[in-house]
């Protein structure tokens, strides 16, 4: 499971997600990708479940890149504990995702295989996503 090796502070405030992604919103490695359409938190287990679903479907062919990393700790107090007495202990890690962020990329497979693999990954995630395809810049020879 993905998580940071070490962090400066064990606990973080929740924060809020404003605006669209300004970085990581284009395909950089693969031919096809999965782009977030709404904001949210994606846990390390959800990322791993999506990765397993994709890699099992594409079998030996192709390569998968995970473009997000869960670096935010989420704390939880034990069940049936009275209010107060401090913040709970870190339970799991999440990646904060803004709309427009590319979550996964795939290369080395056909478009149909990539579409199906990313569709399987979509169902493992708590946010709406869309399929992305690398657009080749068509060269019109305009020499003026």
From Swiss-Prot:
Keyword Cell inner membrane in record:
no
A single GO CC term for this protein reads:
cytosolic large ribosomal subunit
- May I ask which residue range the UniProt record assigns to the signal sequence? none
Question: What are the cysteine partners in each disulfide bond?
Answer: none
Q: Which Pfam family is one of those matched by this entry?
A: Ribosomal_L16
InterPro entries xref list: Ribosomal_uL16, Ribosomal_uL16_bact-type, Ribosomal_uL16_CS, Ribosomal_uL16_dom, Ribosomal_uL16_sf
Q: Which UniProt keywords apply?
A: Ribonucleoprotein, Ribosomal protein, RNA-binding, rRNA-binding, tRNA-binding
UniProt GO BP: translation
> What PROSITE patterns does the entry give?
RIBOSOMAL_L16_1 (PS00586), RIBOSOMAL_L16_2 (PS00701)
Recorded GO molecular functions are: rRNA binding; structural constituent of ribosome; tRNA binding
Q: Record's HAMAP family?
A: Ribosomal_uL16
What is said about its interaction partners and assembly?
Part of the 50S ribosomal subunit.
Family membership: Belongs to the universal ribosomal protein uL16 family.
Q: What does this protein do?
A: Binds 23S rRNA and is also seen to make contacts with the A and possibly P site tRNAs.
Task: Write down what this protein is called.
Answer: Large ribosomal subunit protein uL16
Tell me the organism: Thermoanaerobacter sp. (strain X514)
**What is the taxonomic lineage of the source species?**
Bacteria, Bacillati, Bacillota, Clostridia, Thermoanaerobacterales
**Which gene produces this protein?**
rplP
């Amino acid at each position: 499971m993905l998580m940071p090796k070490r962090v400066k502070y064990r606990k973080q405030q929740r924060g809020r997600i404003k605006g669209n992604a300004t970085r990581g919103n284009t395909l950089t490695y693969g031919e096809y990708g999965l782009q977030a359409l709404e904001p949210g938190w994606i846990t390390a287990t959800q990322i791993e479940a999506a990765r397993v679903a994709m890699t099992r479907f594409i079998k030996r062919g192709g390569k998968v890149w995970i473009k997000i990393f869960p670096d935010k700790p989420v704390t939880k107090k034990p069940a049936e504990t009275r209010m107060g007495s401090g913040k709970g202990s870190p339970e799991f890690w999440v990646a904060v995702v803004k709309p427009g962020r590319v979550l996964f990329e795939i290369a080395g497979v056909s478009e149909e295989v990539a579409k199906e693999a990313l569709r399987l990954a979509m169902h493992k995630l708590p946010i709406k996503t869309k399929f992305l395809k690398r657009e080749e810049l068509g060269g019109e020879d305009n020499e003026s």
